[in-house]
């Protein structure tokens, strides 16, 4: 049940995406603003080719744009120097909006596969 809730929540993020600036000119703060409530910007070293919807039975097709990301670290948008930097300067890997997890270490690397929405799908 939890997995379906997460997928529905993240699918709403994809559906709400608008046409904004290109990913190469996006600041960290703009990226954070594109994430839904309860989500934050993460920089992830790995992403699976299999969409997250397939891991829980396709999610009735609502999981378009979702993927499983791993080896993620949270990008701190509360630091003004970081928030105003370009996203591609702060994250050379895969930038994504991921649901904040209570098990996430504040400054650590999250090794679990998280259902996330690539920021490039949101702008």
UniProtKB/Swiss-Prot annotation:
Induction of the gene: Expression is positively regulated by the cAMP-protein kinase A (PKA) pathway and more specifically by the adenylate cyclase FAC1. In contrast, deletion of PKA catalytitic subunit CPK1 has no obvious effect on the expression of HYD2.
Molecular-function GO term, any one: structural constituent of cell wall
Cross-referenced Pfam families: Hydrophobin (PF01185)
Source organism superkingdom: Eukaryota
Intracellular or extracellular location(s): Secreted; Secreted, Cell wall
Entry keywords, A to Z: Cell wall, Disulfide bond, Secreted, Signal, Sporulation
InterPro entries from the UniProt entry: Hydrophobin
Signal peptide feature range: 1-16
Disruption phenotype: Does not affect pathogenicity in a corn seedling infection assay nor the production of microconidia, but affects microconidial chain formation.
Gene Ontology cellular component annotations, sorted alphabetically: extracellular region; fungal-type cell wall
Residue pairs linked by disulfide bridges in the UniProt entry: 35-97, 43-91, 44-72, 98-116
Homology family: Belongs to the fungal hydrophobin family.
Primary role: Aerial growth, conidiation, and dispersal of filamentous fungi in the environment rely upon a capability of their secreting small amphipathic proteins called hydrophobins (HPBs) with low sequence identity. Class I can self-assemble into an outermost layer of rodlet bundles on aerial cell surfaces, conferring cellular hydrophobicity that supports fungal growth, development and dispersal; whereas Class II form highly ordered films at water-air interfaces through intermolecular interactions but contribute nothing to the rodlet structure.
Protein name: Class I hydrophobin 2
Lineage: Eukaryota, Fungi, Dikarya, Ascomycota, Pezizomycotina
GN (gene name): HYD2
């Amino acid at each position: 049940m939890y997995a379906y809730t997460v997928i529905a929540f993240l699918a709403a993020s994809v559906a709400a995406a608008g046409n904004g600036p290109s990913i190469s000119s996006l600041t960290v703060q703009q990226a954070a603003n594109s994430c839904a409530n309860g989500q934050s910007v993460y920089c992830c070293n790995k992403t699976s080719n299999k969409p997250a919807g397939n891991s829980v039975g396709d999610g009735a097709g609502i999981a378009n744009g979702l993927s499983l990301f791993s080896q993620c670290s949270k990008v701190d948008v509360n630091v003004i120097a970081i928030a105003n930097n370009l996203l591609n300067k702060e994250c050379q890997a895969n930038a994504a909006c991921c649901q904040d997890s209570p098990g996430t270490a504040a400054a650590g690397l999250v090794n679990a596969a998280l259902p996330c929405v690539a920021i490039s799908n949101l702008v």
